[in-house]
């Protein structure tokens, strides 16, 4: 008699994706982040659902409803901080996941990679809308500044901004629609994740060496389920350390002041995970140029398969490309630091140099270095 997990219409799907899935025998801990992102998404949806039960998307009561959640709702404080810091963990895992894809050449799975980039944009949109909901000072001014960037689009820019705001400034209509979008987008992310996995399972996973692994596959369960559980425990440990010891470490103190349209904070900045893109935006003196650079800083990932000139897929045996990759990581950390600094003398020029370096490494240095290494193989 055939095993029920292999014959039942629903269990068969789960079995083929999580139990009997043939996986390469040599994938490292860098392959853990996919499952960690799934855990983060489920955690965010669950905590967000409970927060939405008590939150009111209205300019007069939004700030006090968040205070009410933290003070009066049973375990409301832990749900709120798990949701806020869970977003940070989500982005840490996302950046690691994308970095792994770049390092090991996973972008050669075109459909999986392109859906992944769409997922990244969707998660960033969701996280941006979340920033507006507590209706603190940084919520209001962050939303005003970032949405106002769309006015740089020729002809339709101003109309587009007013259409998104639902008026002539960020107000009740903006808050209500951002709450609605913030609620629905995670479910769209979940659907896109299913498509992402569907395309991945068409080709099978990549591996650190970047070579076909069809001749040496092992079942996903128990080998990688155990490995993923270990990763999940470490993720939850770090998250709970953040939540229980330093819940406001990654937030902005200005958001503990209710939104006031008449008082602008001295330094308007987004959440830490957007600072690298914000630094690229600020490094260009022209508004439209800045917006284009901001979009391109993420959209550039779509072009990675076209920029791949190496005969080898992975960077494992390409030392020069490895050096460039880690310089790129250092550059992104520099941009993140600059994004949080005021716009004054040393930071402006550092930001501009780091922005030039970012695009130079990806568009010029990496493809050229890969081509040079191809010639070195002939020696």
UniProtKB/Swiss-Prot annotation:
Q: Where does a ubiquinone bind?
A: 201
**Sites where the protein binds heme b b562:** 83, 182
- Chain residues that bind heme b b566: 97, 196
Keywords assigned: Electron transport, Heme, Iron, Membrane, Metal-binding, Mitochondrion, Mitochondrion inner membrane, Respiratory chain, Transmembrane, Transmembrane helix, Transport, Ubiquinone
Q: Name where it's found.
A: Mitochondrion inner membrane
Gene Ontology MF terms = metal ion binding; ubiquinol-cytochrome-c reductase activity
Q: How does it sit in the membrane?
A: Multi-pass membrane protein
Q: Could you tell me what this protein does? A: Component of the ubiquinol-cytochrome c reductase complex (complex III or cytochrome b-c1 complex) that is part of the mitochondrial respiratory chain. The b-c1 complex mediates electron transfer from ubiquinol to cytochrome c. Contributes to the generation of a proton gradient across the mitochondrial membrane that is then used for ATP synthesis.
The annotated subunit structure for this chain is:
The cytochrome bc1 complex contains 11 subunits: 3 respiratory subunits (MT-CYB, CYC1 and UQCRFS1), 2 core proteins (UQCRC1 and UQCRC2) and 6 low-molecular weight proteins (UQCRH/QCR6, UQCRB/QCR7, UQCRQ/QCR8, UQCR10/QCR9, UQCR11/QCR10 and a cleavage product of UQCRFS1). This cytochrome bc1 complex then forms a dimer.
Additional note from the record: Heme 1 (or BL or b562) is low-potential and absorbs at about 562 nm, and heme 2 (or BH or b566) is high-potential and absorbs at about 566 nm.
**Protein name in UniProt:** Cytochrome b
Which organism's genome codes for this protein?
Giraffa camelopardalis (Giraffe)
